[in-house]
């Protein structure tokens, strides 16, 4: 059980780092047009702050929607699984009826 928790934590960390790296790359490409200076100028810094803030806000909204929809998705998957499991059982319970219908 502990190993599963560690694997889940590693997956969560990997997912976080992928999102972070993608956000960093996207904002850097948008906001830093040249690398002629060692330091960011005020305009670049403001752009990066705005870009990162927008992406973080969007990510929070997506996660909130995901958390809200997740119980319904799980219930639907359970119902689909139960329905799919019940279909082969019905044909097996009826003697003389083949599953292919012939």
From Swiss-Prot:
Keyword Transferase belongs to the record: no
User: Quaternary state and partners of this protein?
Assistant: Component of the TIM22 complex, which core is composed of TIMM22, associated with TIMM10 (TIMM10A and/or TIMM10B), TIMM9, AGK and TIMM29.
Q: Where are the transmembrane segments?
A: none
Does ATP-binding appear among the keywords?
Answer: no
**UniProt keyword annotations, A-Z:** Disulfide bond, Membrane, Metal-binding, Mitochondrion, Mitochondrion inner membrane, Protein transport, Translocation, Transport, Zinc
Query: Which cysteine pairs make disulfide bonds?
Result: 27-51, 31-47
The organism is Pongo abelii
- Quote the function comment for this protein: Component of the TIM22 complex, a complex that mediates the import and insertion of multi-pass transmembrane proteins into the mitochondrial inner membrane. The TIM22 complex forms a twin-pore translocase that uses the membrane potential as the external driving force. In the TIM22 complex, it may act as a docking point for the soluble 70 kDa complex that guides the target proteins in transit through the aqueous mitochondrial intermembrane space.
Q: What is this protein called?
A: Mitochondrial import inner membrane translocase subunit Tim10 B
Alphabetically, which GO biological process terms does the record hold?
A: protein transport
What would you give as a GO molecular function for this chain, any one? metal ion binding
Location in or out of the cell: Mitochondrion inner membrane
* Pfam families reported in the protein's UniProt record: zf-Tim10_DDP (PF02953)
Matches recorded under InterPro entries: Mito_inner_translocase_sub, Tim10-like, Tim10-like_dom_sf
The residue numbers the entry assigns to motif Twin CX3C motif are: 27-51
